[in-house]
């Protein structure tokens, strides 16, 4: 069903329930596990709901349920504003926000979910409600990190922030220097200000061999930022390094190659406290067995403003400084076995050094151990909200601890 209005979504939910059909929701189309589609069921396609309305004075944008990061950033850029998004322009804003939302501006402006001001939601019983600090406050709390478990978000109001340009780019180092680079990066990030976020990881380099990448994003004073960025290039001998003032949209385009749509992917995830010697050793072994050319690892840094929110203020509970390791296996056609095996082995190598739980938007379906610990002490409250707003389990693609995944439904917004 190609939805063009909340009424279309409402009607589709009612049809699915009346006929006992599985239901899924396609938002931005960036979910690696394909949870936005379901064979033999109904798919609510939100891709036609991509409107963005900007109130530049209030610094607020109202976005449709199918809006992707590129849509939002393009709409707000003429006003010298940005929004907290993921690391790729193709990521859906709604699904990203509902699961938490890591990105290059988290240190300064918080997670995407921290910037959610309100939402219009079609509930499992077909009612259309508004959720914000004064209307359905418990639903509003659950939407900020609890995933697509409570209804279909047809529009959201998100906070915007002034930012014309940042300093960013991509620096590649040879794999032989991986240990030195990550040790140095750990020291740099230990005193990093909120304006300073560095995405790191591994990918296939220009020669086809594994390489370490650093993707800095400095959103503060450009003059001060240049010195910080220059220090990164001295952590090793770069294979390449193009770092300069750029727009936020240009920074997001650095990761267009990892847009999951139309490709074959498997993703695992682990959460770590930092680049300890044990973690670095595990990363080096993971890189040694990397399956090129699309596979890699992306390590997201949660710090600054993202850690200043009380754990119980929103459903997203992990508020201590940490890193999310996104293990990405990519391939073409039927060549899946060795790539999936690499991702599984990478996850296993990091497991002894990982924190409990994981990032809901990236968790492997059926990984009950990480799911059980993903929400911390917020899990009990989330399950109660689930029973109140969706007692029959219509929306269950990102399961909550102790909640059955259900037989009829498999709905969640894609990232």
Identify the role of each PLM range.
Residues 1-415:
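Soluble FAD-dependent oxygen oxidases
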């Amino acid at each position: 069903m190609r939805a063009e209005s909340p009424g279309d979504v409402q009607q589709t939910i009612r049809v699915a329930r009346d006929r006992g059909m599985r239901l899924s929701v396609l938002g931005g189309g960036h979910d690696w596990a394909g949870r936005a589609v379901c064979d033999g069921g109904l798919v609510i396609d939100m891709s036609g709901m991509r409107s963005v309305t900007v109130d530049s004075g209030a610094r607020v944008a109202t976005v449709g349920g199918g809006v992707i990061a590129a849509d939002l950033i393009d709409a707000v850029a003429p006003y010298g504003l940005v929004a907290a998004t993921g690391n790729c322009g193709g990521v859906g804003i709604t699904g990203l926000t509902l699961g938490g939302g890591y990105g290059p501006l988290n240190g300064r402006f918080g997670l995407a979910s921290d910037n959610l001001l309100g939402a219009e939601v079609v509930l499992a019983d077909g009612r259309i409600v508004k959720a914000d600090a004064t209307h359905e406050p418990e639903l509003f709390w659950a939407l900020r990190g609890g995933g697509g478990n409570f209804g279909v978000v047809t529009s959201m109001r998100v906070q915007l922030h002034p930012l014309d340009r940042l300093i960013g780019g991509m620096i590649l180092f040879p794999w032989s220097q991986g240990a030195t680079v990550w040790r140095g990066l750990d020291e740099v990030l230990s005193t990093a200000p909120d304006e300073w976020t560095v995405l790191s990881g591994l990918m296939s380099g220009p020669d086809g061999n594994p390489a370490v990448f650093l993707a800095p994003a400095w959103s503060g004073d450009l003059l001060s930022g240049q010195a910080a960025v220059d220090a990164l290039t001295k952590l090793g001998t770069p294979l390449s390094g193009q770092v300069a003032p750029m727009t936020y949209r240009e920074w997001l385009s650095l990761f267009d190659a990892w847009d999951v749509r139309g490709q074959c992917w498997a993703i695992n995830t682990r959460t770590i406290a930092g680049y300890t010697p044990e973690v670095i050793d595990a990363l080096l072994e993971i890189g040694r067995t990397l399956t090129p050319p699309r596979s890699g690892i992306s390590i997201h840094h949660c710090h600054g403003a993202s850690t200043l929110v009380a754990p119980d203020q929103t459903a997203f509970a992990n508020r201590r400084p940490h890193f999310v390791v996104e293990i990405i296996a990519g391939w073409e056609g039927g060549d899946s076995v060795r790539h999936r095996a690499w991702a599984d082995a990478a996850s296993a190598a990091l497991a002894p050094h990982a924190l409990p739980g994981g990032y809901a938007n990236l968790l492997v379906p059926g990984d009950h151990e990480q799911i059980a610990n993903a929400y911390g002490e917020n899990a009990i409250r989330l399950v109660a909200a689930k029973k109140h707003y969706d007692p029959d389990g219509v929306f269950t693609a990102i399961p909550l601890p102790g909640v059955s995944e259900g037989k009829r439904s498999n709905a969640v917004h894609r990232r």
